[in-house]
């Protein structure tokens, strides 16, 4: 590489400042225009990447979220052409569904009728069935690293794509790590500068790949990421209209790390700032391509470079051909969904139980909308008609962040779409009335005890990481691990442990209670009123109201948070449920609510609970604070909870290769043992199978067997005159369920690129950043194969969410018209929008509500 020429080009591109208002000459004006166009292309490419949350806050995300402004088939074409990524289900999988009768001829015919493009092009059922015998004819556009991979030694080494991905990935792992390495890298100059410095001092890849001039070429790179971006785009010589597409394709080669950087940008946006890491990653990955071109500067590489330019000049036509070719895949996707909708319509058209009169309800239980709550809600109502269950987002409307006692481990407990506005901390409070001084003494002694234990643990762990301890520590302390080894060889059957109490002496655990801090009485009353109204609990309250969050139980599971509550940002719902119960049981808050016309009867008590979704047990908290009458009701409820839990465990047993006829105590023991087994890769199925979201009164689905595939959110349009609650539901929980649905969809349709691979091979990166499959490659995002496949068959069907709302048409239309994000999801085919209607159902199609009758299915 010619250093003088590179510097000259960099100078030419940076002579005109980005904010210059009056270029001095026409040449300056052209340079400014070029600079702006390049920056816009880079920004557009970066905006196409969806965020991926870290392991300890893992929530489901639609990996195509940043592209939902386009119709789903257009996105499918772009992902296939730019990244070799499959969006629709594989044709082989659809062929199996067709041959097994899962998709019927009637389903296929109806799909062809529902898709206007299929009607316009005259697509036939015969064309669709014949197409299943072959793959979609979609060609992926090459990148510079691909066309340069043409030397005679290419079969004896890693491909350039593999080698570069590995090098960039290892660099990112070192740079972003804040939890594993004791010696942290210098990050002050940014990711791009760190990579450039690393590559200059690491001669291994140059020797391994046969690039002796790599070090000199790296030294000649521009020092700033922005200059590197402009230098590469200028060197590539591609037409300006395809810049953003090429840059997006480049980012897709390191999609895992790009998604991590997008997460950093997302968090920065919530805090009102910007983050440069994704742009720097783009500059790194761009620079690598041109480094190869400069190092291989021969006739073959120049010919390959010309091939690249020809291919990308035809990129718009390639994308359009791909979109046309994928029409048949969209037809089959819809046909698969119609097959499910046929069953859903038949079940919802005739609810099994109309409900119980309000005066007969003795207990109300508010569950998360999670699909795993549906079987337990159904079982509870079947076991005892005196219980009414409700569905609400599992964070219970509390925009909180939680910091456990005597720690600085602050974490969000709300959906990833939102930023926390309220802090929750632990208070150590005994049930018996004590003075403020006594409570303060308890708080202080508990804090000191925990800090001492945590400090001792940290010293022990630090000692085990000393370089000199590699052998001596194992020999001296190895025997202490025999107990843990024994637990792994024979897992125990204890109930779920509460990680938030780690390091806290047992005498304080029962009285360590999370509570909201920093709110005056007016703020508490206002928050309580909003939550009660949104939950539909502003009237007709039962004597006992359970606030049931949920959490999972597993051992040795890097993705454990992904099985917890997504609405609580990958945490259990315990903190939110306990904080809200404390708020609503506060007599001063209740008095303030009466001033707003909200009367919580004196005989009503709220109890915080947690649904263990792995074992289907329900645990309650702060029972020592309950009044005698409420405690008596809770104790009387235990046989109902036990019977309902056993019923759900038997329903789930076959999917876990367990015998549903096993005696109830033995079956619970088996599930607990699985939950505590460090070798168990499938402790539960999470949200696999999710396919529908009902926003409606419980009477619409009470007694209906929905198979744990439906999100259920209670909503009463008669109590929402201004439509504000519906607007909230369609812009928050509906978006969250869409994210969940599409993460499962994407990880099933393309497990290699949008899934995290084989869980057995996972190695955690940076403590909480994510995982590698093996010891290298890109950071893996999405769900593992074991979360979706039981070894014989897929446990998740890749269906787009069918949202069924019981609300006036005008109210739904108003939300769609007001919120672009909702309009894009509905109009772009990212989900199905249905509405309950007197004669059955109607569905939203291109701005028109079309009748859906049971007879159609």
PLM regions with names:
Residues 21-220, 259, 630-857:
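Long, compositionally biased intrinsically disordered regions
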Residues 371-373, 402, 551-553, 698-701, ...:
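Short, glycine-/Ser/Thr-/acidic-enriched flexible segments
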Residues 16-439, 443-446:
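Long, charge-dense tracts
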Residues 350-356, 531-536, 543, 676-683, ...:
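Generic recognition of flexible, low-complexity loop/linker segments
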Residues 387-435, 503-544, 549-634, 706, ...:
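Catalytic or ion-translocation cores adjacent to nucleophile or general acid/base/metal-coordination motifs
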Residues 4-16:
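Compositionally biased, intrinsically disordered low-complexity segments enriched
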Residues 428-456, 589-624, 734-782:
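Conserved catalytic alpha/beta cores of large enzymes that bind or transform nucleotide phosphates
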Residues 433-538:
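Active-site cores of enzymes that catalyze phosphoryl transfer or operate on phosphate-rich substrates
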């Amino acid at each position: 590489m010619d250093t003088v020429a590179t510097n000259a080009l960099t100078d030419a591109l940076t002579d005109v400042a980005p904010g210059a208002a009056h270029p001095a000459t026409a040449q300056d004006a052209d340079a400014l225009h070029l600079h702006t166009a390049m920056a816009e292309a880079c920004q557009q490419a970066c905006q196409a990447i969806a965020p991926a949350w870290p392991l300890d806050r893992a929530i489901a995300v639609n990996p195509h979220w940043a592209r939902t402004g386009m119709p789903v088939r257009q996105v499918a074409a772009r992902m296939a052409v730019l990244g070799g990524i499959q969006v629709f289900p594989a044709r082989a999988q659809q062929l199996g569904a067709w041959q097994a009768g899962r998709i019927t001829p009637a389903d296929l015919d109806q799909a062809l009728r529902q898709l206007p493009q299929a009607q316009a092009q005259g697509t036939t059922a015969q064309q669709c069935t014949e197409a299943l015998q072959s793959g979609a004819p979609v060609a992926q556009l090459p990148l510079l690293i691909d066309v340069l991979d043409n030397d005679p030694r290419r079969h004896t080494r890693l491909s350039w794509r593999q080698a570069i991905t590995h090098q960039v990935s290892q660099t990112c792992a070192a740079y972003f790590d804040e939890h594993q390495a004791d010696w942290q890298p210098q990050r002050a100059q940014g990711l791009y500068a760190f990579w450039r410095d690393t590559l200059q001092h690491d001669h291994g890849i140059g020797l391994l790949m046969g690039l002796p001039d790599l070090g000199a070429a790296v030294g000649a790179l521009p020092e700033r990421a922005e200059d590197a971006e402009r230098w590469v785009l200028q060197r590539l010589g591609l037409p300006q209209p395809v810049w953003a597409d090429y840059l997006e394709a480049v980012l897709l080669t390191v999609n895992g790390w790009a998604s991590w950087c997008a997460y950093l940008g997302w968090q920065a946006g919530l805090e009102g700032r910007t983050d440069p890491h994704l742009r720097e990653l783009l500059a790194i990955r761009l620079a690598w391509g041109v480094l190869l071109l400069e190092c291989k500067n021969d006739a073959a590489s120049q010919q390959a470079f010309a091939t690249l330019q020809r291919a990308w000049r035809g990129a718009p036509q390639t994308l359009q051909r791909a979109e046309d070719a994928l029409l048949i895949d969209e037809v089959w996707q819809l046909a698969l969904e119609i097959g499910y909708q046929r069953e859903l319509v038949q079940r919802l058209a005739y609810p099994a139980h109309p409900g119980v009169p309000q005066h007969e309800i003795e207990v109300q239980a508010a569950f998360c909308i999670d699909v795993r709550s549906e079987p337990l809600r159904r079982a509870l109502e079947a076991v005892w008609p005196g219980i009414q269950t409700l569905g609400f987002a599992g964070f219970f409307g509390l925009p909180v962040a939680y910091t456990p006692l005597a720690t600085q481990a602050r974490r969000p407990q709300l959906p990833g779409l939102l930023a926390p506005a309220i802090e929750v901390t632990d208070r150590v409070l005994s049930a018996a009335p004590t003075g403020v001084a006594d409570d303060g003494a308890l708080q202080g002694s508990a804090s000191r005890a925990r800090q001492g234990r945590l400090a001792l643990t940290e010293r022990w762990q630090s000692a085990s990481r000393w370089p000199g301890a590699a052998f001596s520590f194992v020999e001296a302390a190895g025997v202490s691990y025999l107990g843990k080894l024994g637990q792994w060889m024979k897992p125990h059957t204890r109930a779920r442990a509460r990680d938030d109490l780690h390091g806290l002496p047992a005498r304080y655990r029962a009285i360590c209670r999370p509570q909201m801090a920093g709110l005056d009485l007016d703020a508490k009353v206002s928050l309580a009123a909003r939550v009660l109204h949104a939950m539909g609990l502003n009237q007709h309250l039962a004597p006992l109201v359970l606030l049931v969050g949920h959490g999972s139980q597993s051992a040795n599971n890097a993705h454990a948070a992904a099985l917890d509550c997504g609405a609580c940002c990958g945490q259990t719902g315990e903190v939110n449920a306990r904080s809200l119960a404390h708020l609503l049981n506060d007599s001063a808050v209740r008095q303030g609510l009466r001033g707003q016309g909200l009367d919580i009867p004196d005989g009503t008590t709220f109890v915080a609970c947690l649904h263990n979704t792995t074992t289907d047990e329900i645990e309650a908290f702060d029972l020592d604070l309950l009044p005698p009458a409420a405690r008596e009701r809770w104790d009387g409820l235990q046989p109902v909870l036990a019977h309902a839990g056993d019923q759900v465990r038997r329903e789930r047993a076959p999917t876990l290769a367990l015998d549903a006829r096993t005696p109830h105590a033995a079956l619970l023991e088996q599930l607990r043992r699985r939950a505590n087994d460090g070798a168990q890769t499938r402790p539960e199925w999470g949200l696999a199978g999710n396919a529908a979201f009902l926003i409606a009164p419980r009477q619409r689905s009470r007694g209906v067997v929905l198979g744990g595939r439906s999100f259920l959110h209670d909503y009463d349009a008669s109590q929402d005159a201004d439509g504000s609650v519906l607007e909230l539901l369609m812009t928050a929980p509906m978006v969250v369920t869409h994210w969940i649905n599409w993460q499962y969809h994407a990880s099933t349709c393309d497990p290699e690129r949008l899934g995290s691979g084989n869980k057995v091979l996972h190695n955690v990166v940076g403590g909480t950043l994510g995982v590698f499959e093996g010891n290298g490659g890109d950071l893996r995002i999405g769900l593992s194969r074991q979360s979706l496949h039981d070894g014989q068959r897929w446990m998740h069907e890749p269906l787009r969410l069918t949202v069924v709302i019981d609300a006036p048409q005008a109210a739904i239309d108003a939300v769609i018209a007001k919120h672009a994000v909702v309009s894009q999801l509905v109009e772009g085919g990212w989900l199905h929008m249905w509405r309950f209607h007197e004669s059955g159902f109607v569905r939203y199609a291109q701005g028109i509500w079309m009748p859906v009758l049971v007879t159609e299915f």
